[in-house]
Curated annotation (Swiss-Prot):
Entry keyword annotation includes Chloroplast: no
Compositionally biased residues, Basic and acidic residues: 351-393
Species name: Homo sapiens (Human)
Region (Disordered) residue spans: 242-262, 330-413
Name of the protein in question: Nuclear pore complex-interacting protein family member B15
Matches recorded under Pfam families: NPIP (PF06409)
Glycosylation sites: 111
InterPro entries: NPIP, NPIP_N
Gene behind the chain: NPIPB15
Length: 443
């Protein structure tokens, strides 16, 4: 009983701890390959990644059940095994390998034999960690990764909202584009799209027919005028086919005869003998007698005078007789201009009543006004200059008498103002007084 109890505890401790027993490891690998739920379930070091066969697993289970010999323990063991398998199936794997494909398993096994575990980056510590025992990527790192993603998404959404709000605010305040700039921008965009469509879209045959005809005629004219096989810018399908069939026109160099040498022929070509041609015997041909032809007797026909043939009767035979007879004058048909030679009487009277026009004098007949003669400086009468009177002859004005300050009215002025009194004002006052005294009194 004690042995069975300690065996059960040993199995449970091996399940909970990070060092599982070979039995549990083999069971886990057989049922759930490459998974560990909270435990470091991996192949036994002695197995080197090989999965035990189902026969070995069955033998181990039979040995355990036969060794325990109790139905209760067997039921408990099977129940715990099924629970562990169920939990491993539900929960995620910590090292990220759930055995979904054989390729991943092989890659992980080859990498495990080289590095003894997978290496990845922990989102919490930002360090590279491996799937060794005690240093696994756990649930905490998964939660941290999820929080990090959520924070990043929130920041992006907030940035988009702020940008939208700013753009809308600027558009309201008129900081984005004015109506004129917006119209010009839209026009430029439309022209750019039309240019792109022109290069991208194909012209339908219905719209291409008149273009082909015009292109064909223009290319033909260009070809005949310039001597080129075709116009390189006119590349319609019909024009290509037609121009491809026709031979190229003769150029200036090809139009020269073969026996004549061009000016552009290099001097080296003159030294080599030319190939034999049909024109080599052209000198012998004029010496040989020509065969008789119809034109040989042409000179004889020209020397023999032709017999006169009578002309047919014509209307002009009696023209000489008619010229000597004078023609009678033929009266002209009446017209409206016959009465314009003699003007009517009313017009003559109106012209007689008009005043005669003044006679226009010639330049020679007009009396020119005499020009004033230029006199010398001696002949000009000088205006008499005013005589300068002497100082003695000039009327001497009486000098104003100096009065004392005591006689001045010092009621409203000070001594300084009394000194600055103008003497000429006093003189004028004195003259006025004298005039009043000498003036006769009238009754």
């Amino acid at each position: 009983m004690r042995l069975r109890f300690w065996l059960l505890i040993w199995l449970l401790l091996g399940f909970i701890s990070h060092q599982p027993t070979p039995v549990i490891n083999s069971l886990a690998v057989y049922r759930h390959r490459e998974t560990d739920f909270g435990v470091g379930v991996r192949d036994h070091p002695g197995q080197h990644g090989k999965t035990p066969s189902p026969q070995k697993l069955d033998n181990l289970i039979i040995i355990i059940i036969g060794f325990l010999r109790r139905d209760t323990f067997t039921i408990l063991f099977c129940t715990s095994y099924l629970c562990v398998s169920f939990l491993k199936t539900i929960f995620w794997s910590r090292n990220g390998h759930d055995g979904s494909t054989d390729v991943q398993q092989r890659a992980w096994r080859s990498n495990r034999s080289r590095q003894k575990g997978l290496r990845s980056i922990c989102m919490h510590t930002k360090k590279r960690v491996s799937s060794f025992r005690g240093n696994k990527i756990g649930l905490k790192d998964v939660i941290t990764l999820r929080r990090h993603v959520e924070t990043k998404v929130r920041a992006k959404i907030r940035k988009r909202k702020v940008t939208t709000k700013i753009n809308r605010h600027d558009k309201i305040n008129g900081k984005r584009k004015t109506a004129r700039k917006q119209k010009m921008f839209q026009r430029a965009q439309e022209l750019r799209r039309r240019a792109e469509d022109y290069h991208k879209c194909k012209i339908p045959p219905s719209a291409r027919k008149p273009l082909c005809n015009w292109v064909r005629m223009a290319a033909a004219e260009h070809r005949h005028s310039s001597g080129l096989p075709c116009w390189p810018y006119l590349t319609a399908e019909a024009l290509k086919n037609r121009m491809g069939r026709q031979p190229p026109p003769p150029t200036q160099q090809h139009s020269i005869t073969d026996n004549s040498l061009s000016l552009k022929t290099p001097p080296e070509c003159l030294l080599h003998p030319l190939p034999p041609s049909v024109d080599d015997n052209i000198k012998e041909c004029p010496l040989a007698p020509l065969p008789p032809s119809v034109d040989d007797n042409l000179k004889e026909y020209l020397l023999v005078p032709l017999p006169p043939s009578p002309l047919p009767p014509s209307v002009d035979d009696n023209l000489k007789d008619c010229l000597f007879v004078p023609l009678p004058p033929s009266p002209l048909p009446p017209s409206v201009d016959d009465n314009l030679k003699t003007p009517p009487l009313a017009t003559q009277e109106a012209e007689a009543e008009k005043p005669p026009k003044p006679k226009r004098w010639r330049v020679d007949e007009v009396e020119q006004s005499p020009k004033p003669k230029r006199r010398r400086a001696d002949e000009v009468e000088q205006s008499p200059k005013p005589k300068r009177q002497r100082e003695a002859e000039a009327q001497q004005l009486p000098k104003p008498k100096r009065r004392r300050l005591s006689k001045l009215r010092t009621r409203h002025c000070t001594q300084a103002w009394a000194i600055r009194i103008n003497p000429w004002v006093e003189k004028k006052k004195k003259i006025k007084k004298q005039n009043k005294t000498h003036a006769p009194k009238t009754n």
